[in-house]
Design a protein with these regions (language model features):
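A short helix->loop->beta-strand "cap" motif at the edges of active sites that frequently abuts
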Residues: 34, 181-185, 455-457
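P-loop NTPase Walker
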Residues: 1-55, 232, 453
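Conserved helicase motor core of SF1/SF2 NTP-dependent helicases
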Residues: 13-16, 155, 159, 166-251, ...
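Conserved beta-strand -> loop -> alpha-helix junction used to position metal-binding or nucleic-acid-contacting
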Residues: 13, 33-50, 292-318
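Conserved two-lobed SF2 helicase motor
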Residues: 38-41, 139-144, 148, 405-413
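Conserved helicase C-terminal RecA-like lobe
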Residues: 316-462
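Conserved interdomain hinge at the start of the Helicase C-terminal
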Residues: 254-268
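Accessory N-terminal region flanking or inserted into the helicase ATPase core
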Residues: 7, 75-161, 170-175, 188, ...
Length: 475
């Protein structure tokens, strides 16, 4: 690598991104994972550097206790994982927002507009929350960054790499600058056109104003010509941005403005994007009514266990063997007794967890009494009627419960970093987003730019049937 692995730091926002970076580094440079001790999220770095333990961190039970004491559910408004708190909440997120932006609760309240209970309610909740943490001796994620910055020291790293810097909040920029002071070289990777988390405190202006050597990756391996032209036209309207020269793939690609009902989803890979979960939920209902099998926000339209039980029974009928874990899941949905699984056998006591199991083995040794010619809905009698009807609807419609559905639904924010052969992008926005958009339209330009650029071949833009839509993508 040219440097000792423990003198290199790679920092990103999600555990998934850091794990992927570790995998790539281990493969390319032939180093053991344990040597890459500073490949972490920023919060994990602060946690490690401050010497924190599990008991130092606020837990779900603490939030439940806070609710029981004060009747206030603050858990969805404070950062507790790799993803930010929800965009459309009751205003309680301002209690976290002012801390990550290094501002004040009063300032964020003025910028936000009306909130039920007003500023006094927010101040009271903020005080109660701080007192609660102090009494229990616990920290939340934002406290980790705050305390790291107060110490103003970091691991002595020769090389610092920070990914997705367009999403850094002011307190995280402060943290990065502390590391930069001690580093020989710093590499910041990001795209200001994809800065879509301003509502959670991210400050893209710090990237745009950065005085540094700029290197643009000038070739896209995803975006075809037509989608390149339309998406570039959209972001060119952003008032303050870094101008970039880059090239699309040589393929043309296609863009259509059309209604959702006219699109044939049976063939190819599809990613359906909405600005908020409300629109995704509406599409989800329609797809379920039509018998499509799909994935919404990384979850199957039917539970993983039900899908696994169904596939397992079909596999046994096809004379295939199934794994120990799949047998256990399948047994959950079978009755106990003569027509199902013998009493005491559902948990597979004493079975080898590494083995594969045929129908013959299960029926002779592991209590499976269900005849092999029984249909899946008879064999898996404990699947609820509504789920059975949905599976039958999927099968009647000519679809299958494949391992990976060909249709995925997501908010635009949830799909960042993803891609698909075909993308359907709804132009709908909520009234709240519409009202806020006039103060900073550039934020929505960036969001819909991210949505458009998920498409590898075809982009279908669906006009809104409501008064509220981001009409710029229809031009």
């Amino acid at each position: 690598m040219g440097r000792e692995p423990d003198r290199i730091g790679y920092f990103s926002f999600t555990k998934k991104a850091t794990q992927e970076a570790i995998d790539r580094a281990c493969t390319k440079f032939k180093v053991p994972r344990k040597d890459l001790k500073w490949f972490r999220t920023l919060h994990s770095l602060a946690y490690q550097w401050l010497g924190c333990t599990y008991t130092d961190m606020i837990q779900k039970q603490d939030y439940k206790d806070f609710y029981n004491q004060h009747g206030i559910d603050i858990s969805k408004s404070i950062k507790t994982d790799d993803v930010p708190f929800g965009e459309e909440d009751s205003g309680l997120s301002l209690i976290d927002l002012y801390r990550v932006k290094n501002t004040s609760l009063e300032e964020e309240f003025r910028n936000h507009g009306h909130i039920k209970g007003g500023l006094q309610r927010l101040q009271r909740i903020d005080k109660l929350y701080r007192l609660f943490k102090n009494q229990r001796g616990v920290k939340d994620y934002t406290d980790l960054i705050t305390e790291f910055n107060k110490v103003a020291q970091s691991p002595r790293l020769d090389i610092v790499i920070v990914d997705e810097v367009q999403d850094l909040k002011p307190n995280e920029w402060e943290m990065v600058r502390i590391m930069m002071k001690q580093a020989t070289a710093t590499y910041l990777a990001g795209d200001d056109d994809q800065a879509i988390y301003s509502w959670s405190g991210a400050d893209v202006s710090k990237l745009i104003d950065l005085d540094c050597h700029l290197q643009v990756l000038n070739q896209s391996y995803r975006i075809p010509k037509t989608i390149f032209a339309k998406s570039n036209n959209l972001v060119s309207r952003i008032k303050k941005r870094i101008n970039k020269e880059w090239q699309p793939r040589k393929e043309e690609g296609k863009i259509r403005n059309t209604n959702f009902e006219s699109i044939d989803l049976n063939e190819g890979q599809w990613l359906i994007l909405g600005r908020t979960n409300y629109y995704i939920d509406e599409v989800s209902k329609e797809l379920k009514n039509k018998g499509f099998f799909y994935e919404k926000n990384n979850r199957l339209s039917i539970s993983n266990d039900i899908a696994t039980a169904y596939r397992s029974w079909i596999a046994l009928q096809n004379n295939e063997e199934i794994s120990y874990s799949h047998v256990k899941i399948m047994y959950q949905f079978m009755s106990v007794g003569n027509g199902g699984v013998s009493r005491g056998k559902k948990g597979l006591p004493g079975a080898d967890m590494e083995s594969q199991y045929s129908y013959e083995t299960l029926s002779k040794e592991w209590g499976l009494n269900t005849p092999l010619n029984y249909s899946w809905e008879v064999a898996l009698i404990r699947i609820t009627e509504s789920d059975r009807n949905y599976i039958k609807h999927i099968l009647r419609s000519g679809h299958e419960l494949d391992e990976k559905p060909n249709i995925k639904l997501s908010t635009i924010h949830g799909a960042k970093g993803g891609e698909s052969q075909n993308v359907i992008l709804f132009s709908d926005i909520s009234k709240r987003i519409n009202d806020n958009m006039w103060a900073n339209r550039d934020d929505e330009r960036r969001v819909f730019y991210v949505g458009m650029t998920r498409a590898k071949e075809n982009l279908y833009i669906v006009p809104s049937t409501s008064p509220y839509e981001f009409e710029e993508i229809l031009r």
